[in-house]
UniProtKB/Swiss-Prot annotation:
Pfam families: Ribosomal_S8
Signal sequence coordinates: none
Family matches, as PANTHER family: 40S RIBOSOMAL PROTEIN S15A
Subunit and partners: Part of the 30S ribosomal subunit. Contacts proteins S5 and S12.
Gene3D superfamilies: 3.30.1370.30, 3.30.1490.10
One cellular-component annotation, GO: ribosome
Keyword Ribosomal protein assigned: yes
HAMAP family xref list: Ribosomal_uS8_B
GO-annotated biological processes: translation
Protein name per UniProt: Small ribosomal subunit protein uS8
């Protein structure tokens, strides 16, 4: 095991694992970046809701997962793109698409964390954090 930790990959793994176990919610250690990513997932309809929980430390994000009428998770794919050992960036002209625009890309830009659609609207690029479908 290497000494490098990747909080974003851990966050995404916790969401995937909770969905596989068909949990109604999952508690994840909070950070500004994870909160921003979770807000995007909420706005785009991939989760039901989330709340901040004070635990006398860094806090927790309680993410309420969303399933369809057949108990299939709303998030079908959650893939980490840029990693600590291999950062990936895209400028505003070359932002990737997921499933021909049906999914979203989450980016960290100079204007904050946003979806690919928002980044196109603002004409900014940034680090490609994740792809969601």
């Amino acid at each position: 095991m290497s000494g490098i930790s990747d909080p974003v990959s851990n966050y995404m793994a916790q969401l995937r694992n909770a969905q596989e176990a068909e949990q109604t919610y999952v508690d994840i250690p909070a950070s500004k970046l994870k909160r921003a990513m979770t807000q995007i997932l909420l706005e785009k309809g991939y989760i039901k809701n989330f709340v901040n929980i004070d635990d006398e430390k860094q806090g927790l994000l309680r993410v309420y997962l969303k399933y369809d009428e057949y108990d299939q998770p709303a998030i079908r794919m959650l893939e980490r793109v840029s990693r600590p050992g291999r950062r990936e960036y895209a400028d505003s002209d070359n932002l990737p698409e997921v499933k021909n625009g049906l999914g979203i890309v989450i980016l960290s830009t100079s204007r904050g964390v946003m979806s690919d659609k928002e980044a196109r609207r603002f004409g900014v690029g940034g680090e490609v954090l994740a792809k969601v479908f």
